[in-house]
């Protein structure tokens, strides 16, 4: 008789995903970030749930309710610090996960990849509306600036912005609906994650060589279940260290000042994980052009499978393409730095060059280099 985990309708699904799943024997630590993202999502949902129990989404009390959570609620300070810094770790894991996918050619699983890009957009939207909730200065002005970008949409732009605001400015209606969205989206993300995994398990995991690994599989449990647990421990220790020792390291001091529509902060900027996209937005001196560049800076990931020209899947044996990949990583870091700088010389020109290079690498350099490597190897 088959064991219960193989015959029970529900346990069978868990078994096929977590126990008896055939996994390539050579997947490295770069394959840990998927499970770490799952851990981040669970952590954020749980801490967020407890924060929502004490938070009030009204402009008169939102800021003070967050102060109340930190001062009067049992371990409220800890829950808030884990939630705020958990978002940073979420994005660190996302960017490393995407980088892994780009480096090893995982994007050739097109359905899995495209659902992943949709997940990235959902997480970015969730983080944006969440940042508005404490109703500090940067919350308010960040919401004003980013929602205003929609006014660049031809013909319907202004109507669209007022519709999202629920009035003629960022006000109580805006905060209330942003809280509703921030509560809803993580569950949408959880559902999309299930779809992401369904598509992944259709094909199985890629591996560092990019070659077919059917001849060398190992069961997920115990090998990768324990490897994932080690990753969990590392992530939780790092998150606890940041949340306990320097919880405000990545935050903006302006957000300790309650929102004031009459005083604009000297430098409006988003959280660090959006700075690269913000730099691309600012590098184009035209509103609609900037908005399109901002959008395309993320959606360009969907074009990567189409622009893949190499006969090899992974970059493991492609030194020229490796150089371009690390150039892209350096470029994103430069954009992140520029996004946090004031709009003045030399930061403007550095941002424009880095933004051009970002798109040039994706759209021209990487495809041409892939084709060139085929030629060099005589693989016409």
From Swiss-Prot:
Keywords: Electron transport, Heme, Iron, Membrane, Metal-binding, Mitochondrion, Mitochondrion inner membrane, Respiratory chain, Transmembrane, Transmembrane helix, Transport, Ubiquinone. GO terms for biological process: mitochondrial electron transport, ubiquinol to cytochrome c. It is a multi-pass membrane protein. InterPro entries: Cyt_b/b6_C, Cyt_b/b6_C_sf, Cyt_b/b6_N, Cytb/b6-like_sf, Cytochrome_b, Cytochrome_b_C_euk/bac, Cytochrome_b_N_euk/bac, Di-haem_cyt_TM. A ubiquinone binds at residue 201. Gene3D superfamilies: Cytochrome Bc1 Complex, Chain C. Its cofactor is heme b. Binds 2 heme b groups non-covalently. PROSITE patterns: CYTB_CTER, CYTB_NTER. Heme b b566 binds at residues 97, 196. Its main location: mitochondrion. It is found in: Mitochondrion inner membrane. Disulfide bonds: none annotated. It holds the Pfam family Cytochrom_B_C. Heme b b562 binds at residues 83, 182. Component of the ubiquinol-cytochrome c reductase complex (complex III or cytochrome b-c1 complex) that is part of the mitochondrial respiratory chain. The b-c1 complex mediates electron transfer from ubiquinol to cytochrome c. Contributes to the generation of a proton gradient across the mitochondrial membrane that is then used for ATP synthesis. Belongs to the cytochrome b family. PANTHER family: CYTOCHROME B. This is Cytochrome b. It comes from Paralichthys olivaceus.
